[in-house]
Amino acid sequence: ANADASYAGEMTLTDAVKWSKNTVAWNIYQQITPKTGSSFLIKMGFHKIWVDKDYNAGALGGFTYGVTTEEMAGGYAALANDGVYRKATCIRLIVDASNKTVVNETNRDSKVYDKSASRMMTQMLREVVLSGTGTSANVENAVVAGKTGTTNASKDVWFCGYSKYYTTTVWAGYDYPKEMSGVN
């Protein structure tokens, strides 16, 4: 369902993202096929995606086994990085005293999205922060893009966002599904 449980008629994709009109995401997911949509997530290390079980609900983030904040941050970081996914690590390179490489995580990048598609998505997500459901994440003198997400009865609440230098994902909820009052 749409975030506000209302139908708004035809609209731009930017407005659909900005106002969490999830029926638009559902329709696009059906057009590109769930198999294609899920393949992008799998390329970015979403390890618990079951294409056969999560087929249609995947358009709205409804996955049988859920996703982690690390997986979500990696997905959004790929958008911030012009479509290039980089596996999260706190160590990129270690070289010993004799200049021998001990650990090298610098060449693990993989292109997931076209640069132009990533930049268009960033523009849409920028609108979410400027004047949509994510205005609380707007930072003065910084370019921030992101998306809010809320499950039915606010059992889970998400914000995933990024700037030029940082990507973050915030999840609020309980270990066992329980409504959080006063959350929007």
Question: What positions do the PLM features span?
Answer:
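Active-site-adjacent helix/loop patches that line small-molecule binding or acyl-intermediate pockets
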Residues: 2-48, 52-81, 126-127
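A penicillin-recognizing enzyme superfamily signal
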Residues: 15, 66-184
